[in-house]
Amino acid sequence: MVYTDTVKLLQECDAGTKMAVTTIDEVLEKVRDTEMKELLQESKDHHEKLGNEIHSLLNSHGTEEKDPTLMAKGMSWMKTNMKMGMDASDATVADLITDGCNMGIKSLNKYLNQYKEADHKSKDISTKLISIEEKLCKDLSKYL
């Protein structure tokens, strides 16, 4: 059970990092404020670095990476484009990214509780990813 929970938790973290990177990429070029753009780029870099670590661990377990579901990606894309179409401001970007972070934090905590038998390393990665999301939410709050 430890192996199964470990792999499943890592796969959920993998999907989460990919979703974060994709979402940040969708809005980054639309951000006007230089500091906000730097915050988003820094967070994207953290997500990519952690994603690479997750990929290595999944490979060492002989399992495949996990992409976000098509439904999640499609809904995110629609919401982003609809909101940005109505108001392409930095406040809208901050709102969208904050919503995404909150969904990520909620999901990751759910998976930490669900995959209790996961190994220490995968739990640490989940916790690190939650911290990255929480920091980004806090940093973006001044743009809301």
Q: Which residues does each PLM region occupy?
A:
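Amphipathic alpha-helical hairpins
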Residues: 1-144
